[in-house]
Regions:
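A hydrophobic, small-residue-rich beta->alpha segment in the mid-to-C-terminal subdomain
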Residues: 207-255
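Compositionally biased, low-complexity flexible segments
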Residues: 1-17, 37-39, 47-49
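Charge-rich, low-complexity N-terminal segments
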Residues: 24-36, 40-155
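Cysteine/selenocysteine-centered motifs that mediate thiol-based redox chemistry or coordinate metal-sulfur cofactors
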Residues: 247-291
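Low-complexity, intrinsically disordered or signal/transmembrane-proximal segments
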Residues: 17, 22-24
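Structured beta-strand/loop patches that form or line metal/cofactor-binding pockets in enzymes
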Residues: 152-209
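Hydrophobic residues embedded in beta-strands of well-ordered beta-sheets
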Residues: 111-113, 180, 219
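Short acidic-glycine loop/turn motifs at beta-strand connectors
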Residues: 107-110, 177, 213-216
Length: 291
């Protein structure tokens, strides 16, 4: 069991309290298949902003011993081309549980950048009565027959950075007026990129513990209770080393508190290419075996 306040019994470092994200602007639904907001007006059209940080992120990552041995296989299927349609998939070990469709924004030494728009086709694992993982206790969920259900993403637009190293991805969120409002640090298994029969994708496993970060760089852990609850069922849970997950979050928080890339304002003014068309349905092969 993880120590409630930190790794190995250490007190957790906590920033000032972060108010409920988007309390005045946009709802971030806990279950992506239900209760999403109504379709928003599109973000203002314009050229993508991919300004480079004054601190070279590739050098920073390479110099950080916490990232050694965590190199992702993003180059194996790359380089990805801007505008390509991509499926971003989450697994619990080998079982597919979540898929969203988006576009490649860019792919270079800083990592793979994706745009996941509101309204994109997606699939999510649900119980036979239409409930999701977060709609019931984990002890009940693991006894449920489930099915992958296709729907659309009702949450907000997401700009996502999958870095070349590290067990995480960083997400940018804007309100419906196009104002940057949050970073989200998603702690996850190092991603694997792939190409198969003309389809491109990125596969990972969510590690459940996450972080919200405001533009002022205050921060707050998210979903600690879910991690704690699920660790009581090791034969069913997909996070083998919760201490390593928290340590990865703490590593990212050092960058947050230093105002270093990617938390230095890079891409906060991003706008998607207006020529990108959201697909009407998930592409063929979206449910292929894990790469």
């Amino acid at each position: 069991m993880v120590a409630p306040a930190g790794t190995g019994g250490r007190a957790a470092r906590r920033g000032p309290h972060v108010p409920s994200p988007y309390s005045q602007a946009v709802t971030m639904p806990e279950s992506p298949a239900v209760n999403g907001p109504a379709s928003p007006p599109p973000l203002p059209a314009g050229a993508s902003s991919a300004g480079r940080s004054p601190t070279d992120p590739a050098s920073r990552l390479a110099a950080d011993p916490a990232t050694q041995g965590a190199a992702r296989s993003l180059t194996a299927a790359g380089p990805y081309r801007p505008g390509e349609v991509v499926v971003h998939r989450s697994f619990t070990t080998k079982r597919l549980v979540f898929v969203r469709t988006g576009h490649v924004v860019g792919h270079d030494e800083r990592g793979l950048r994706l745009w996941i728009p509101h309204g994109c086709p997606m699939a999510v694992e649900l119980s036979a009565d239409g409930r999701g993982l977060r709609d019931m206790p984990f002890a009940e969920w693991i006894r449920q027959p489930t099915v992958m259900t296709t729907t659309v993403w009702r949450g907000p637009n997401i700009f996502m950075l999958v870095p070349p190293q590290g067990a995480n991805s960083v997400w940018w969120f804007w309100d419906w007026q196009g104002r940057f409002v949050r970073w989200y640090i998603n702690l996850e298994e190092p991603a694997v990129a792939w190409r198969h029969d003309g389809l491109v994708g990125v596969d990972t496993t969510d590690h459940d513990l996450d972080l919200w970060v405001t533009p002022e760089r205050t921060w707050e852990w998210k979903d600690e209770h879910e991690l704690e609850e699920r660790l009581a069922f090791p034969e069913h849970y997909w996070v083998p080393d919760p201490d390593a997950v928290r340590s990865e979050g703490e590593r990212l928080l050092r960058l947050v508190e230093a105002g270093a890339f990617p938390f230095d304002g890079t891409w906060t003014d991003f706008r998607p290419d207006p020529s990108w068309q959201t697909p009407d349905a998930l592409p063929a092969g979206w449910d292929r075996p894990r790469a």
